[in-house]
Amino acid sequence: MSITCRTSLVRSAPGKYETATVEVDDPQQDEIRVKMVASGLCHSDDHIATGDIPVGTYPFAGGHEGAGVVESVGPNTKGFEVGDKVVFSFLPACGKCRWCATGHSNLCDLGAGLLAGTRWDDPSTRLHLEDGTNVGQMCGIGTFTEYATVAVDSAIKVPEDTKLEVACLLGCSVGTGWGSAVNTGEVHPGDTVIIQGIGGIGANAVQGAVHAGAANVIAVDPVAFKREKAQELGATHAVESIEEATEIAKGFTNGQGADVSIVTIGVTKPEHVGNAFA
């Protein structure tokens, strides 16, 4: 039977998050219902409230970085049992489409419906207000909800000793930031790297660049404590402006500039991208 619990949702945009009582459906085939233990807070969640990121269904439950414990499993659903610890991925991976089959699960066909708020294969949701109104789930998850019924395509089982309050961040900020340096940026040993914006994603980009062996990691952020944190995480330099970073990079590369430039600014504008090529 459905579970009554609380969520934090936006009724329209621009708007504010508010607490609401919701009904969470039983899981169907290839779905699980999870008791949320921890959720991250991503800048994308704020973009939902401001309207910078439009969505297809209002009200809309926020949150896409989360981890919890499986409370129930849908019929004929394989790979999960009640009590399993899971971490959510904001990008689903079906394992069947062309992209998943060729090792590019970040491009899974299911990702096209991330912000619709509904299921991948029909216009319904698994979350409703008490009057029956459908509530959209961010990335098909909605980790700001105490319980969430989600497709198994969005859940990864993790070891029993996993600390979920830490692991919840793996679903977006770690994968996005680390991946921007290691996978997309393809940072190599000895490279000079500039990273603009040291929030959750930028901080992980710093760590990814350091792990990949970059000789010089230049973090750019106007906020002092973020620059300090970047250096704690391995950045060799931390400056306030892209102009400063560019001059430092040129000094290491005989005037050529950075080998890799990563933009992880919360609200990215064309000039930020242009500066990355300077």
Predicted regions and their residues:
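Short amphipathic alpha-helix with an adjacent loop that forms part of the alpha/beta core around
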Residues: 245-255
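Short SAM/SAH-binding signature in class I
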Residues: 256-262
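Glycine-rich beta-strand-centered segment in the early N-terminal region that forms part
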Residues: 25-39, 52-101, 106, 114, ...
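Short Gly/Pro-enriched turn/cap motifs at secondary-structure boundaries
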Residues: 23-24, 57-63, 136-140, 146-147
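Cytochrome P450 core scaffold surrounding the K-helix E-X-X-R motif
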Residues: 43-50
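Cysteine-cluster motifs in flexible loop/terminal segments that predominantly coordinate metals
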Residues: 90-153
